[in-house]
């Protein structure tokens, strides 16, 4: 019998998934959490001068068209697709917890805010204030899954006070250990092992909360001094047992996680990266977003259509790449993996 949610890794056969939306996407007005999380490399003057507010209409139109193309690919592979309930939040309004106020952000990247580990839905405690209410868009889906028997654990809502943040333009994260913070896009699921990136969007207290919540069935491995910005899925992407894509500019050979000992590695290098276009200055995602791929099963992977070198490397390892158009990956900060959250994958909990 299929469980209402079940996903233990990034590659088992995919059966059910959430795909995000660009509707209402917005760049928050000047806000400390936005500066520290996404733009810590900018001076306050540079950050304040950035364009803010809504995107041009064509960005939304093209992004939604591309997401529909992704949905079509998934449905042709017999994957059930859910979409966010965009009636829940008016993205033109502000968000506040009483101590601060800022604009809404977007729900383009469900992977950033939610994940499934085994038979459990996890809602993150995100570092970006503008995303404070974002998971409300998935509540209807989660309530249905809960009523069908799944576990559903939201993290404690963070205060996100000014004292949480420090503008760190170098290698160190721009959040402190004041309270548990975790964007679920900071983790890679590897069966019993959970790789956890310490960065601007996930701290050690967040890792401790996750370990305590999951219990002894899983082991959370904190990765320090690897990549201090946001999220892990343009740095490390396992494709199947024994094969992983690693970002050559971010993962030194002496920092490769031990779980990948004896695995084959596709090094996503400067030569391989095609340099995804940004349609705005100060795009929140780098050109490395091109390795943000989504596996349908261990032999099939959805890849941004420009990434021809990566697709060729996959084919040499027996993986069939499925190209998808995603014109605003850098602008809206999400490739096929980011804009999705798998709810059900076949397979069992294993040690890799």
Q: Positions of the model-derived regions?
A:
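The feature marks the mature, well-folded catalytic cores of soluble enzymes
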Residues: 1-352
């Amino acid at each position: 019998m299929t469980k209402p949610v079940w996903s233990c890794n990034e590659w088992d056969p995919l059966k059910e998934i959430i795909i995000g939306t660009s509707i209402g996407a917005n760049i928050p007005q000047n806000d400390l959490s936005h500066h520290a999380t996404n733009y810590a490399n900018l001076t306050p003057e540079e950050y304040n001068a950035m364009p803010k507010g809504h995107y041009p209409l064509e960005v939304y139109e093209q992004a939604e068209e591309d997401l529909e193309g992704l949905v079509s690919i998934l449905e042709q592979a017999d994957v059930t697709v859910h979409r966010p309930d965009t009636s829940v939040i008016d993205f033109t309004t502000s968000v506040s917890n009483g101590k601060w106020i800022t604009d809404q952000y977007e729900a383009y990247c469900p992977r950033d805010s939610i994940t499934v580990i085994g038979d459990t839905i996890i809602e993150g405690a995100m570092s970006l204030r503008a995303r404070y209410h974002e998971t409300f868009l998935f509540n209807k889906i989660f309530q249905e899954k809960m009523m069908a028997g799944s576990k559903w654990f939201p993290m404690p809502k963070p205060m996100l006070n000014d004292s949480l943040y420090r503008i760190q333009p170098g290698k160190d994260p721009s959040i402190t250990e004041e309270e548990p913070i975790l964007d679920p896009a900071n983790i890679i699921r590897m069966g019993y092992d959970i790789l956890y990136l310490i960065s601007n969007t996930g701290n050690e207290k967040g890792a401790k909360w996750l370990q305590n919540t999951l219990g002894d069935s899983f082991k959370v491995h904190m990765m320090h001094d690897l990549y201090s910005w946001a999220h892990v899925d343009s740095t490390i992407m396992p494709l199947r047992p024994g094969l992983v894509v690693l970002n050559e500019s971010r993962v030194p050979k002496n920092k490769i996680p031990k779980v990948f000992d004896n695995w084959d590695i596709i090094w996503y290098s400067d030569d391989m990266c095609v340099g995804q276009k940004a349609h705005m200055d100060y795009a929140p995602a780098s050109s490395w977003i091109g390795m943000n791929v989504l596996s349908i099963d261990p032999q099939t992977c959805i890849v941004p259509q420009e990434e021809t070198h990566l697709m060729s490397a996959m084919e040499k390892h027996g993986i069939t790449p499925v190209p998808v158009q995603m014109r605003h990956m850098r602008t809206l900060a999400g490739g096929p993996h980011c804009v999705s959250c798998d709810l059900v994958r076949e397979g069992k909990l294993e040690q890799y």
